[in-house]
UniProtKB/Swiss-Prot annotation:
Pathway: Carbohydrate degradation; pentose phosphate pathway; D-ribose 5-phosphate from D-ribulose 5-phosphate (non-oxidative stage): step 1/1. The lineage of its organism: Bacteria, Pseudomonadati, Pseudomonadota, Gammaproteobacteria, Enterobacterales. SUPFAM superfamilies: D-ribose-5-phosphate isomerase (RpiA), lid domain (SSF75445), NagB/RpiA/CoA transferase-like (SSF100950). This is Ribose-5-phosphate isomerase A. Belongs to the ribose 5-phosphate isomerase family. Substrate binds at T28, G29, S30, T31, D81, G82, A83, D84, K94, G95, G96, G97, K121.
């Protein structure tokens, strides 16, 4: 199976976790796009969705799936999204698609976070994939200097503005032994909106696409 076929398999497998009559949190990226395609097949069974990006919102609306503002709802039972890396503790690096802040907000609200990914995203130690950090534009240089002090090599992601109007620094050269500690440290930097480490709030279930089928890992 190709990588895209593995992504499609986990996107459809995530439908098993959708409860009829509920609002579903939807992530961003190529794997989440397959979940949106799958969700369209049961769109009349759900109340609607909450979206983590303008890109996902456009795809959902193209299928005629209702999209709610997160502020309009009191609770969210499920959030489904991909990951750039996921370790054995269900902690992740996310934000390759620059939607990390809205993704993290929805993950915080949701009762259950289902991570969908192909097997290439599984790692023992996070950090081979550059760690995205969303930053207020005027703080870019300051935050970059502080990230160097933490052992990283930050690189400004050119020509990318987030849906929130901010910029992204991608941090290389990190071997993230203590993800929660690093998440806390980077989030504490003035000018940082959020970091793409999903460690304090990781996934509850991971659906991993493999050549032998979809593997389910539970926290």
């Amino acid at each position: 199976m190709t990588q895209d076929e593995l992504k499609k398999a986990v996107g459809w497998a995530a439908l098993d976790y959708v409860t009829p009559g509920t609002i579903v949190g939807v992530g961003t990226g190529s794997t989440a796009a397959h979940f949106i395609d799958a969700l369209a097949s049961i769109k009349h069974q759900i109340e609607g969705t909450v979206s983590s990006s303008e890109m996902s919102t456009a795809r959902l609306k193209a299928y005629g799936i209702p999209v709610f503002d997160l502020n309009e709802i009191d609770a969210l039972s499920l959030y489904v999204d991909g990951a750039d890396e996921i370790n054995g503790q269900m902690q992740m690096i996310k934000g390759g698609g620059a939607a990390l802040t809205r993704e993290k907000i929805i993950a915080a609200v949701a009762d259950r976070f289902i991570c969908i990914a192909d097997e290439s995203k599984q790692v023992d130690v996070l950090g081979h994939f550059p760690l995205p950090v969303e930053v207020i534009p005027m703080a870019r240089s300051y935050v970059a200097r502080e990230l160097v002090k933490l052992g990283g090599l930050p690189e400004y992601r050119q020509d990318v503005i987030t849906d929130n109007g901010n910029i992204i620094l991608d941090v290389y050269n990190l071997s993230i032994i203590d993800p929660i500690r690093l998440e806390t440290a980077i989030n504490a930097l003035t000018g940082v909106v959020t970091v793409g480490l999903f460690a304090a709030r990781g996934a509850d279930v991971a659906l991993i696409g493999t050549a032998d089928g979809v593997k389910t890992i539970k926290k």
